[in-house]
Each structure stands twice: as C-alpha cells, then as structure tokens.
C-alpha cells in the first residue's frame, strides 16, 4: 500500500523532474496578507507573484502546503469528524506556473502523474471544464484517454475561479474519479447533479488568464498562469482504496493511539468514532498551529486554537478520557510528521506544554461552567420557567466553551428545553461582529494605496546597509491621499519614491527611517519610511522648503542618531533572543518585536513569568556580549544553507530562496533584513525595564539600550536618593526599611480587622431579635454599621449560622453609597432565590446586583431608600 508520505514525495519529485522549483510550505499564518486569518490554499504564498507585486528566480513551482480552514466560507468545523472528508488542517499538493506554461502542460502533467506515478485506472477518471472553455476540452481529448462523454461542461459557480471581486481570474478544470456504483446515491446520481461521493473531485486546475475590473469586465492577462491544488488526504484515500480520509495511514496511527488511551475501539459505534476522528483531526491542527507561533487566546487566531483544543478535549470526555490527553495525541502527530516537517520536532516540548496548560485551564473552566448552569437552572426552576433562554446558553458557550448539545443534555435531564433560536441569533451576531472586526492591520491599506506603482513594476534599490546618504531620482510623487502629482509645495504632505534610497522601510518589526530629501528647488522632511512590498520603498514626506518635483535628482540623508539608535536596539534584540534561549531553554522563539530608536520590545514563547534571577541572568548575558565588542557579519545565501549554519528562522516570517544572515560570532545567527551595529560594543548598555504576559504562553520584555539605558539608570539613581531621604535610610538600607514598614502595616491591619470582627459578632447576636414573621417566613431586615463590605459579609455568615429557616437582608451605608446582602435558607429556595429578591429590592436604593440562589449582593447610590427596600422585600415574601 502506498503511504501518504510516499505520495507527497512522488508528487514533489515528479514536478521537480519537470523543471519546477520545490518550494517549502509557508506558515499557517499568512505573511503580509491581513485579509486572511490562515493560509488556506497552496497559492497563498505566491499571491503577490500572481498580482505582479513580486518576482522570484523561478517561473514554475511545486509545494506541499500546510493549510487550515476553520473560518469564513470554509467554516465547516461542526462537520469535522462527522463526514469522511471535512478537516481543519490538511496538506495541499500543488504546481504553479507564473507566466511560463499554461493549459496544455498543466493537463499533460496532471494526467501523467495520476496514471503513471499513482497508476489510477484511466477508465475511472473524468474531467470537468468551464462551459465556454473549448480549448481545455480539446486538450483533455488530445493528452488523455478520457473520451468526450466523460468530459463535462460546468457553469461559473463550479468551474470559474477568481482571487476576489477584481484581479486575476479564469476557468478551471477538475479531475474526478468514479468510486464505483456501490456509492450511487440514487437514479439522479451524476456529475453536476448531486453531491454524493461516487464521483469524487481529486484535483483542481485553475487557468488564470483574465484580469477582472470593478465592473466585471475581463481582459486577457499578458502572461497567463497556472494554480493547481490536490488534497493529500483525499488522494491518499483514493490510492489506499478506503472511503474515508480518516481510514488512511495519515489518521489511523493517531486514532489507534487514542483508542489505547481511552480503552475503546474504532468502528464500534458512531458516537465513539466521531470523537476519535475529531481528536485525530484537531491534534494535527493544534500541533501545527502552535509550531507556527499561534498560541491560545480570546481573539483572532489564538481564539480559533483555543476552540479546537476545547472541542477536542470535550470529545475526549465523551469517550472516557477524564484526564488530560490532548498533549499526548499532539505529540503523536510529531512522531508521524516530524520527518517531513522538522519544525514540529524542534518545538515539540513547548507545543506539548502549551496544550497541557490549556487542557488544565479548560478543566477548571468546565467546572465553573457547570456550576453556573446549575445556578441558572435553580433560578429558572424557582421562577417556574421551563425554558433556558438563548442568552444563557450563548454565555455558557462564549465564556466556557460549552457547546449547545451539552447545555441541551443537562437541561433536558432537569426537565427544561433550550431556546436554540435565540442562541443561534446571538451566535450570528457574534460572527458578524468578528467579521467586521477582522480587517487586519494597516498593511493591507498601505499596500493597496501603492498598488498602481507595483503594477507598473516600480522598484527601489536599497543602499542603506552601507550608506546613510545618497543620490537618487524621484520616480513617483503623490499627495497625502496617494494620488499622483507633479510637485509638492512647502507645507504639503505626500509620498515620494526614488530609484535608489538609503532609507530603511518599516519591516521585520523595525521602524522606518526619518531624515531629509533635497533637490535644487526644494526640500522635504521624511517623517516615516514604509515598505509596501519587498522591492518598493516609499518615503512619507512633508515639504518644508520650495517645491519638490517629479523626475528631479535629489540628495537623500537619513537622520544618523535615530538610525544608530534603531541599530542598537535591533542588534540587542538578537542578543536578547539568544540570551533567553540560553537561560530559559530552546523552546523560546520570537513571537513578535518592535525596534524603534527609543526602545525595543520583544515577545517570546514561554509559559511562566520570568523570575528576578532569570531576568538578571538574561541582562548579564546580553551585556557580556556587548562588552566583548564582537563584530557583526552579514551574508547572503540560500535559505537551506542558512538553516544548516544554524540560523534562526522566525515564526510567521516568509523567506525567499536567498536570505540575509546576521551573525554575531557563535552568540547569535538569525535571518534578518534589518539594520545593525558594526560591533556589539556600540550598543553601550542593555537594560530590561519590564517583563509581562501578553497572551497564554507569550511573554514580553521591554528594554532600553545606549543613551536611553543610561538616562534610565540615572533616573533610577535619582529616585533611589529621594527614597533614601523619605525613609531616612542609606541606599543599602532601603529594602530592610520598607520590609519593617510593611510588617508594621500588617500588624495594624490585623488589629483593625480583629476589632471589626468583635463588633460584627456582637451585632450578629443582637440583631437576631429583630426577626419577624411574614406570611409564615422568618424575615430579618436590619440596617447595620460595619467598617467595610467584608465585615458585612462576615456578619451575614454569622446571621446565617443562627437562621435555620428564613430570609435575611442586611443593609450598610458608606457615605452616599449603600450595600445590601440577602440570604435565603435552603428549604425556601424552591419559592425564593436571593438573586430574584435582590433584583427588585436593590432597585429601591438605585442599584442592582446578583449572586447564588442562597446569597446575593448589591450596591446602590440612595441610602434614603433602605426602608423602602425592606418594605419591598416584605411585599415580595408576603405575595
């Protein structure tokens, strides 16, 4: 039986033999494409090439691209595990032509690979073409053994592809395989007639031959291109002769491993099988997402990861996995796929820790969610309701990850139904909000503003690695709205592009340069430099003298102090990264950075907050390398050679075949396009000013270098002197003096709490005499004097210990505010609950509140309404 790994290998080798460059899979996090949450197709990493914004050294490529589809039109998450072919993570095999070959070779290659390499039976293969694509049909007849009766013409919905409302588009041709008559869905079964699995699409060939404008008009592209995609999981199922992708070797190893953990059997019952398939699918997605730098959070990509972990964990509970297990199945993915994706092995320990921590967190969350649901059901029962409102079900789902079916199950056992329509309406609102919020960063807007320049093939030669000034010619001039102009006059703002520039455009976390550009007739101040594409640098300018004109020769000068300050911070960012890995471990990876002239910010993967000792060790390591004054070396080389040299490739970054390597002896080797010092000693000093958490598994260090670090040290010394004066202690005695004051403060606080407790206890004994009978219910409603809210709660606890059956309400005034607490004994909770009562009672004092069925608390702003509140409580009890 041919394995999935063998199919992947044969595919890439086949296209390499036909002149294609085998390109590495890009990250699941799209680089420079804020329109996408995840990489969801093989062509994503080549999008700028298809749009004419980028050029590569090759004109044909082949990839096995890792993809994730869990959002937008591809959001079929609830179907994963329930069908044979829905997945979150999958691999897309593809071949691409960038103005090289077109339809004929695309069809020839596909037919040859399927029938000669994979040896699929020719008599079972079919093709579809776009209804108007006579050329594609003739090419299939010419280069394959598919007869005319097995070639189907389809409409635009099925066989026409576009990148968006505008841009490259074209017809496509799908290859299908007949899986046999036993798969027939009925008398109307057939291609284009039904969606059953008899005629299974295995490969889609897209012929990009038009450029569509905003009106829908299509013009032929000067260089038509090819984009094809074939799902590895699907073609593996076909080659291995199994109906479901989950029955292939891709998934079976994970499924059987999970069976061993849960002591269950696959193919025993539908519920168990679904759970096993979900766990296998999600384990793959989770392992690759974390490896590509995505970490659990409550927004964006991190929220998707958290949902997948919780969904898989919940399905594990359904088959008896009550302990954490998902980190183990994710490690099984590493065992299976680590040879083809080495990054999985490199990050396996960290990945497993992140998953384990998220499992533990979800365990605690589930307990809280169950408690909340029980409280809500008790409140509903007391009020006589028989239906769980949709907002409660939604809150449980949104806050605790409780799927609707769990709420349904628990509610049904207690005799309740659930408002599913209300739940779905709130879910729809949330999705619409999320869709509106996901507009990405400003990168997309910046790139689109300068799209005309990119389409014209405009490029800038960057000379800033070696020079801070230089000469160039203005090749594009725009006003502040990025509209083409012939000149900028003094006081006007706009954008300027030169054929050569020493200005570094913001990228890789480093801020853009500032400076001046002068011509014989005028001068502009460069307030920022941006980089809408790898080969185009745009200066954001403000004219300060005379006029600056299109096509003028100009002198460009970068502000040296800011450039050098940025270089200090960028070099120290590399040193910090290396130091963190030495002190904390190799699991540390860069998760984001900011390099500005005045500071650096570095986000990195690490589970726990750093200790003071660890921070001090990292700071010492960086300063050790600074004081060693080690020269920096830069070199350009092939990506694979750089990796062999040990260069660090960063999460989420997209690298071309040739990369720039920045090396600091044996201390640090990274792929980097930024500007740096010539030697580490130029950094002067490195000072960490803060360490904090920014997301689950991601920490952040902010630091200063050079003069900024020196100024911070001087400021700290000044503050130390002030503290010494205030505490009447020498600098070396400050800590012991503060500790002494803290101890004294704790003693005084305990004395105050003891006095308050004594007063509270005394009130508790006395106010019990104020209890009255209201409609057969013992009611205590009393206004009390206490020092704080904690004392009020303590007093209520004292009252509850003496009130065997009844309702108590205590009110305390603090200035213009009032606090209320209501307690209901257990025997009365079928008639009254504390949250029910306090809602109406608190309204009398201008407040609101909530709590558990046995006790609820509220705050108000109208102390004068306390008597009315007590009266309201009596009326509620008396009916």
From Swiss-Prot:
GO terms for cellular component: cytosol. Zn(2+) binds at residues 570, 574, 672, 676. It is an enzyme of class 6 (ligase). Gene3D superfamilies: 2.40.30.130, 3.10.310.40, 3.30.54.20, Bira Bifunctional Protein, Domain 2, Threonyl-trna Synthetase, Chain A, domain 2. Its EC number is 6.1.1.7. Its cofactor is Zn(2+). GO terms for molecular function: alanine-tRNA ligase activity; aminoacyl-tRNA deacylase activity; ATP binding; tRNA binding; zinc ion binding. Keywords: Aminoacyl-tRNA synthetase, ATP-binding, Cytoplasm, Ligase, Metal-binding, Nucleotide-binding, Protein biosynthesis, RNA-binding, tRNA-binding, Zinc. GO terms for biological process: alanyl-tRNA aminoacylation; negative regulation of DNA-templated transcription. It comes from the Bacteria. Pfam families: DHHA1, tRNA-synt_2c, tRNA_SAD. It catalyses: tRNA(Ala) + L-alanine + ATP = L-alanyl-tRNA(Ala) + AMP + diphosphate. Binds 1 zinc ion per subunit. It is found in: Cytoplasm. InterPro entries: aa-tRNA-synth_II/BPL/LPL, Ala-tRNA-lgiase_IIc, Ala-tRNA-ligase_IIc_anticod-bd, Ala-tRNA-synth_IIc_core, Ala-tRNA-synth_IIc_N, Ala-tRNA_ligase, Ala_tRNA_ligase_euk/bac, DHHA1_dom. Catalyzes the attachment of alanine to tRNA(Ala) in a two-step reaction: alanine is first activated by ATP to form Ala-AMP and then transferred to the acceptor end of tRNA(Ala). Also edits incorrectly charged Ser-tRNA(Ala) and Gly-tRNA(Ala) via its editing domain. Consists of three domains; the N-terminal catalytic domain, the editing domain and the C-terminal C-Ala domain. The editing domain removes incorrectly charged amino acids, while the C-Ala domain, along with tRNA(Ala), serves as a bridge to cooperatively bring together the editing and aminoacylation centers thus stimulating deacylation of misacylated tRNAs. Belongs to the class-II aminoacyl-tRNA synthetase family. This is Alanine--tRNA ligase. It comes from Nitratidesulfovibrio vulgaris (strain DP4) (Desulfovibrio vulgaris).
